[in-house]
Amino acid sequence: MEGVRVPIACALILLAISSITSASIVEHTFNVQNLTVSRLCKRQVITVVNGSLPGPTIRVKEGDSLVIHVLNHSPHNITIHWHGIFHKLTVWADGPSMITQCPIQPGQRYAYRFNITGQEGTLWWHAHASFLRATVYGALVIRPKSGHSYPFPKPHKEVPILFGEWWNTDVVALEEAAIATGVPPNNSDAYTINGRPGNLYPCSKDRMFSLNVVKGKRYLLRIINAAMNIQLFFKIANHRLTVVAADAVYTAPYVTDVIVIAPGQTIDALLFADQSVDTSYYMAAHPYASAPAVPFPNTTTRGVIHYGGASKTGRSKPVLMPKLPSFFDTLTAYRFYSNLTALVNGPHWVPVPRYVDEEMLVTIGLGLEACADNTTCPKFSASMSNHSFVLPKKLSILEAVFHDVKGIFTADFPDQPPVKFDYTNPNVTQTNPGLLFTQKSTSAKILKFNTTVEVVLQNHALIAAESHPMHLHGFNFHVLAQGFGNYDPSRDRSKLNLVDPQSRNTLAVPVGGWAVIRFTANNPGAWIFHCHIDVHLPFGLGMIFVVKNGPTKSTTLPPPPPDLPKC
């Protein structure tokens, strides 16, 4: 059933029940199925939810609980990840394949059950098994609970803006070929706004997102980068935007004419409709290519904003196009990413923990896989601190943790890189080529409950310096500082913002640079930390944080639900 609300007392099977009397259970059914569509002059079979691209928008209030029945009618294994949801004691619903569950096989089903606590804003959901995320995704909107309001002017309307990528090919086969050959997949054929490429692409004149506005009104744009592998610049001609939230955490208002958004990230921005009604205005997005030497699709998607009350007809109105930054404008990207700050004392604001229990320095980037007999070489690999992550095949990591099953993962992820070197020097492998090769493993870092962890994420340039959007499941983290070059504690500790840093679940670590993040491990379970450039995770750019149970029942992981899929 779709969008049903019932009193929360009727659902005693939920693992956590809100004490707020106005809270509800919001229940949906996701039918995962194949669909034949026409895009870019070609008919293509894709996998979608409920027959649409993007899939349905889930709307809840803070304090609600969600039950999503996923029925897999597709020919592919599937899982759904609820990107950015904390999943306090509901980690069995987090969704990454072989991390918290085995995939839902064709013809099978699974009910994701979780509560929405301490979060407001824009999140999203997507497939977390193979490249199906290219077409299996949608928005997850969390509004304040009844009687509470936004900490900014009430908008006239809320508008989801989801960026995507489109391939004129079978995306599952595309990923399988990339993994087999160790070569990145072909670039996408188009970018999309709400599933529509826009009129700069072939056979797409009438396939453009359109937004009608009323002059003098405010609109809340809920912007989501669901693109697979590309960070994006986004602008609206003749309009400025006020950022009020990032990754479902309120920010101090930040006025800008350009949004920069990495795969996995969300931005809430207010648009004030204050321009001439006799002109229309394109919204447009194109790549921020942090690694100029790496091929990327240098095309542009666009939608259009029309004002009501115009004296001219739609066909005769001029349409203005925004001037987007250069594809390689790292300074504009860095300025946007680093200028966001927290809305101190706003709803659900969490101060920075001042005392750190665990310190880690983690290198991230691409390398090469050592050649085995009868294999194609060289293959690209990716790693965190030279550990190239491999998904288990027999049992999910969370089940192994809960049932204490040995041999599924190793608890040896290091606090420091095994070899220290000049991380951002692109010529370092000329004298030490062995740095290029990574070891395959399924490595985890074990954390005691309530441990405060500080992680320095250090990009390296062994293959190509690149900005990696790093996503942590189950937590938000404070972004204390960012910079370029090699992190130097004697120089860079003074840059830490301990007062009002932004909190995120996905951070684009600067190209050829570093970032310092801090979080408290108060959520028991197995949580993957990985690059959200989708081709990089199967190459190995990930690791696991296993957070142990706390001392009480309310801090102890419950057993798996009876319908948890089997491998």
Swiss-Prot record:
EC number: 1.10.3.2
Cellular component annotations (GO), alphabetically ordered: apoplast
The keyword Glycoprotein appears for this protein: yes
PROSITE patterns membership: MULTICOPPER_OXIDASE2
Subcellular location: Secreted, Extracellular space, Apoplast
Amino acids binding Cu cation 2: 83, 126, 532
Keyword Glycoprotein attached: yes
GO terms under biological process: lignin catabolic process
List of residues binding Cu cation 3: 128, 473, 530
Residues carrying covalently attached carbohydrate according to the record: 34, 50, 77, 115, 186, 298, 339, 374, 386, 427, 450
Signal peptide: 1-23
Annotated binding of Cu cation 1, by residue: 81, 471
Enzyme's top EC category: oxidoreductase
Keywords (A to Z) from UniProt: Apoplast, Copper, Glycoprotein, Lignin degradation, Metal-binding, Oxidoreductase, Repeat, Secreted, Signal
InterPro entries: Cu-oxidase-like_N, Cu-oxidase_2nd, Cu-oxidase_C, Cu-oxidase_fam, Cu_oxidase_Cu_BS, Cupredoxin, CuRO_1_LCC, CuRO_2_LCC
GO molecular function: copper ion binding; hydroquinone:oxygen oxidoreductase activity
Cofactor note: Binds 4 Cu cations per monomer.
Main localization of the protein described in the UniProt heading: secreted
Tissue: Predominantly expressed in tissues other than the inflorescence stem.
Reactions catalysed: 4 hydroquinone + O2 = 4 benzosemiquinone + 2 H2O
Short name of any one Pfam family annotated for the protein: Cu-oxidase
Cofactor(s) listed: Cu cation
Annotated positions binding Cu cation 4: 468, 531, 536
Family, similarity comment: Belongs to the multicopper oxidase family.
Chain's role: Lignin degradation and detoxification of lignin-derived products.
Record's protein name: Laccase-7
Lineage: Eukaryota, Viridiplantae, Streptophyta, Embryophyta, Tracheophyta
Gene: LAC7
